[in-house]
Amino acid sequence: MTRYTISRRTFFQQAAVGVCAAGIGKYAVGAPAKRPLNVLFICVDDLRPQLNCYGNRFMHTPNLDRLAGKGFVFDNHFASVPTCGASRCSLLTGMRPRTEQALTNEAFDALPREDTGKPGSLPELFRRNGYTTVSVGKVSHNPAGRRYAKPTARTDAAGRMVRSGPDDHEPELPNAWDRVYGPTGPWSDPWSAFFGYATGKTRSYTDAKTPAWEAAEVPDTGYPDGLTAEAAIQELNMLREGPFFLAVGFYKPHLPFCAPREYWEMYERAAIPLPDHSNPPENVDRSLSLHRNGELTGNYVALKSPEKATEEEMRL
């Protein structure tokens, strides 16, 4: 395994060299005549560097450790913006988030829809140079990579859940993909699959008691990420002649924490070390967490007043 700490300038210099080495047509300088390389781009939602290859020995991450052992492990990586959609938009387009909308989860909605004739994103660059580009799962912000109205916590006069946002089902990243989709299995739509529980259930935006985790006795394909992995394998088989740019986005470990029981049973909960706080506030019990984050408090548990988290909840 190679530990790699580089500056931002060095990263972009070497990324430019890598694009040229891949030989992607007219945008490559001195492109070699050999067969261009294929690209498998994997993104994982809300994954921290809490992996065995980053020194967390209690973590069971053999496949990621194997991948790290064959490549580079970055120790000095920073997101350009903390918001999920804005960060993905900045990464895929190379644009610095400077406007108000570019700092939000709706950053992709601000991208120009028309075809300008020039690549506006990384996958579009590959597509314009002869690559087949495919997006499976959550690569941009929306699950399945398309624009559709999202459920909210609001209800109308008839008690129906209100949805918001563009609903034209166009790809969030324009002119970038030959195919863009996300498997839904028993769930009604990609957004329901994103927050899916086993047997097709999904998070309720109007029920504060929706569980924050689940460990059902199901195979990998009993949850959306297993279906995404299966679809990605099928795409690899279909695209084997290349060249291709295949982007695969997994939902977990985004809330709710749902996975087949066999993965939960790999861990002895009492043996999981509690996280340290690098800059804890003074005179506050370390087991007390006060925040206004609706992901955990508003949508999954109802706290009427500040309470101490149990050790089990902290390990979760």
Model-derived regions, located:
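Formylglycine-dependent sulfatase
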Residues: 2-316
